[in-house]
Amino acid sequence: MKISRRDFIKQTAITATASVAGVTLPAGAANFVTDSEVTKLKWSKAPCRFCGTGCGVTVAVKDNKVVATQGDPQAEVNKGLNCVKGYFLSKIMYGQDRLTRPLMRMKNGKYDKNGDFAPVTWDQAFDEMERQFKRVLKEKGPTAVGMFGSGQWTVWEGYAAAKLYKAGFRSNNIDPNARHCMASAAAGFMRTFGMDEPMGCYDDFEAADAFVLWGSNMAEMHPILWTRVTDRRLSHPKTRVVVLSTFTHRCFDLADIGIIFKPQTDLAMLNYIANYIIRNNKVNKDFVNKHTVFKEGVTDIGYGLRPDHPLQKAAKNASDPGAAKVITFDEFAKFVSKYDADYVSKLSAVPKAKLDQLAELYADPNIKVMSLWTMGFNQHTRGTWANNMVYNLHLLTGKIATPGNSPFSLTGQPSACGTAREVGTFSHRLPADMVVTNPKHREEAERIWKLPPGTIPDKPGYDAVLQNRMLKDGKLNAYWVQVNNNMQAAANLMEEGLPGYRNPANFIVVSDAYPTVTALAADLVLPSAMWVEKEGAYGNAERRTQFWHQLVDAPGEARSDLWQLVEFAKRFKVEEVWPPELIAKKPEYKGKTLYDVLYRNGQVDKFPLKDVNAEYHNAEAKAFGFYLQKGLFEEYATFGRGHGHDLAPFDAYHEARGLRWPVVNGKETRWRYREGSDPYVKAGTGFQFYGNPDGKAVIFALPYEPPAESPDKEYPYWLVTGRVLEHWHSGSMTRRVPELYRSFPNAVVFMHPEDAKALGLRRGVEVEVVSRRGRMRSRIETRGRDAPPRGLVFVPWFDASQLINKVTLDATCPISLQTDFKKCAVKIVKV
């Protein structure tokens, strides 16, 4: 039998993907392996600790230690598969440098910011924290305290943190590291649909006819979902895969259409497709007339830089970047008509034929399209626009909220959706899509939390980028970091990150399991419990909430972030944090601590210890004398029930392999906004985008605008940063797994061979990557998995010995306030 080279690549793609993903045993064998009678191990379910896919795993415990993990064959998400990172979950908690005692900078037996780290007791640690926070609150008020949290917080950790800051300290200066990864997606959902998170689910992978990847390397970042794309492509020959990126990566092995485009010009291509749909009379007029409205957004909105930056000073609409006016369909058609094939092809460097092939997939009414994106769209100075504009394509054609027709924002962290977004740990949000700027939303939160009216501030707090700037400027002085490594992850860290941590006026606390770059820059380091060392809940990218029990104890004196938050609340009486006029509205709170008001309020503490499953430990329940996790969850769930964010009762999640909200009458929802699938859609409406008052989604007219920084003669290369399969985020867990470390020990500079040759460089040569902000040393790689075009270099950011974010620019999308890590100008200098 003859087989072409292309067919050979197609057929081997699934094998290669399975190889890098790490396919586990067939279900029957897997069940045998996890049979406690055979293995003499106790096996329990849990979601994976890594990305937002939400794979289910089974965890084996022996002698109070995790000794094995494998893909859960009963999990709908991954059906028994694991990626290579998931295979080594059992090792992430057992690095040799695991933190087991609090560490504080000391000199002569006392705290000193310029001292060396020394072990202290928890009482000593909290004593100093208490002193510093009370000092700052007294001197400057609640705007001078803050917290940087995480999409890796469990649901109840994020909820407890939001309560402590927004209600207890009365400060909205709490933000998650999801600001770096999912803020543009969230803002895009809210602007278009009035509600956050995808309307579809992973079932769409088995129903789509075409997959279009906009800036997403799923083969490495979401490998289990990529196996589903691969399976669909190879099982159904008419299925098409389109991969758009600024450089070639592993997804291109499966692509029917591979498109390399100039950075930022995805905006122009999106408008071209909308124009193509209209010009070729492929608009679903019935759907558009019934279910959409058109708006034109303001332009020239700046780049989220400091106010004195020339680009910010020149921007005409930086003060209100999200403003928009209603327009007609004809006005929208005229707006996108400027984006014709000649203009867009020249701007993007994409051949016209490929643009038309891509556009036809969206335009053809018989092709079900799944659009998929991650950081390529979200880490973008116009990231919110990019999200809005891809929804335009699905709304114009009516290809939305039905099986296989799905604009799908993939998530990078295990609970960026479930905790950062749904719980509302962003500086402007409250639970269930409510916001601090809305008086009715604040009133509802205060009612549920039993707070006096006016407790929650009405202005958004400092977002992630602004927190670093305010630390540097001395306006944010008491700061707590949990479950993230922002000194490695934040852009422009030498100019805007590290100075704030070392500012003598500031006291920085970092809770972590390992001595990360961020921990080493702190004043106090608190040892945290990890993953199954505590009871937890995550919410994944398809709205699936998943629970797990505590399976082992944390080592030494390590404590969960939840325990740390709630225990610290005992240190503050309301008189020390609230003004007298506020307490006068609730005089019964006089003399009580924030712990009493927030966590022993008759709601959070109403579930007794006997409700805890006797088969499992629960360190927090034991410490506080009630089922803390259940109480927090049930109080939190009150926000969403009856409002389109319905969560099932707490105990149901310990039985199920996750449930996709809204969960109404015990039934999960796979497709939102569609009649017959979503219980909130009224009979006879067909579709209802009920997040907006009129029940309609918004189609936005938005232009192409250039990036904040582009290559020039002095800095001739684009720099793109990102991740690799073997490591997750900053590598603080994966680099401590020997097998993963050996597979990709250090970051490299992926570069086109001709660019390297022109500079007199060869593979393996040491170079410096230099920008206007800083420099970083690495080695050139001209082969391998990633192949940049000429004029662009790609550098992963997992390597703590190569801090590429010394170089990046802290420009953001002015609407979402998410950083653009994908576009800045650099030069490459031989060492």
UniProtKB/Swiss-Prot annotation:
Catalytic subunit of the periplasmic nitrate reductase complex NapAB. Receives electrons from NapB and catalyzes the reduction of nitrate to nitrite. It comes from the Bacteria. Induction: Expressed independently of nitrate induction and anaerobiosis. Gene3D superfamilies: 2.40.40.20, 3.30.200.210, 3.40.50.740, Dimethylsulfoxide Reductase, domain 2. It is found in: Periplasm. The lineage of its organism: Bacteria, Pseudomonadati, Pseudomonadota, Betaproteobacteria, Burkholderiales. Its cofactor is [4Fe-4S] cluster; Mo-bis(molybdopterin guanine dinucleotide). GO terms for cellular component: membrane; nitrate reductase complex; periplasmic space. One of its GO terms (molecular function) is molybdenum ion binding. Predicted to be exported by the Tat system. The position of the signal peptide cleavage has been experimentally proven. SUPFAM superfamilies: ADC-like (SSF50692), Formate dehydrogenase/DMSO reductase, domains 1-3 (SSF53706). Its EC number is 1.9.6.1. Mo-bis(molybdopterin guanine dinucleotide) binds at residues 85, 152, 177, 181, 214-221, 245-249, 264-266, 375, 379, 485, 511-512, 534, 561, 721-730, 805, 822. This is Periplasmic nitrate reductase. Residues 1-29 form the signal peptide. It catalyses: 2 Fe(II)-[cytochrome] + nitrate + 2 H(+) = 2 Fe(III)-[cytochrome] + nitrite + H2O. Its main location: periplasm. Keywords: 4Fe-4S, Electron transport, Iron, Iron-sulfur, Metal-binding, Molybdenum, Nitrate assimilation, Oxidoreductase, Periplasm, Plasmid, Signal, Transport. Substrate binds at residue 797. Component of the periplasmic nitrate reductase NapAB complex composed of NapA and NapB. Belongs to the prokaryotic molybdopterin-containing oxidoreductase family. NasA/NapA/NarB subfamily. [4Fe-4S] cluster binds at residues 48, 51, 55, 83. It comes from Cupriavidus necator (strain ATCC 17699 / DSM 428 / KCTC 22496 / NCIMB 10442 / H16 / Stanier 337). Binds 1 [4Fe-4S] cluster. Coiled coil: none annotated. InterPro entries: Asp_de-COase-like_dom_sf, CT_Nitrate-R-NapA-like, MoPterin_dinucl-bd_dom, Mopterin_OxRdtase, Mopterin_OxRdtase_4Fe-4S_dom, MopterinOxRdtase_cofactor_BS, Periplasm_NO3_reductase_lsu, Prok_molybdopt-oxidoreductase.
